[in-house]
């Protein structure tokens, strides 16, 4: 899964961003569960999911701040 750049993330709608954030949070939970039960094969996936989640949450908070102003 290639990481999207900031321009690609900013082109998404608010609902798409929210859906992706929720999906990534679920995936991160599942990865933690798999790691705890020693079933996780791809440990690098943690980093990928966290980075993508941070990008989406940053864009979401930027939009909320600009809407509040």
From Swiss-Prot:
SUPFAM superfamilies reported for this sequence: Ribosomal protein L29 (L29p)
BP term (GO), one: translation
Alphabetically ordered keywords of this record: Ribonucleoprotein, Ribosomal protein
Q: Name one Pfam family in it.
A: Ribosomal_L29
Cellular component, GO, one term: cytosolic large ribosomal subunit
Q: Name the source's superkingdom.
A: Bacteria
Which molecular-function annotations from GO does this UniProt entry contain?
Answer: structural constituent of ribosome
Q: Which NCBIfam families match?
A: L29
Q: What is this protein called?
A: Large ribosomal subunit protein uL29
The species this protein was found in? Parasynechococcus marenigrum (strain WH8102)
Q: Which classification does the entry list for the species? A: Bacteria, Bacillati, Cyanobacteriota, Cyanophyceae, Synechococcales
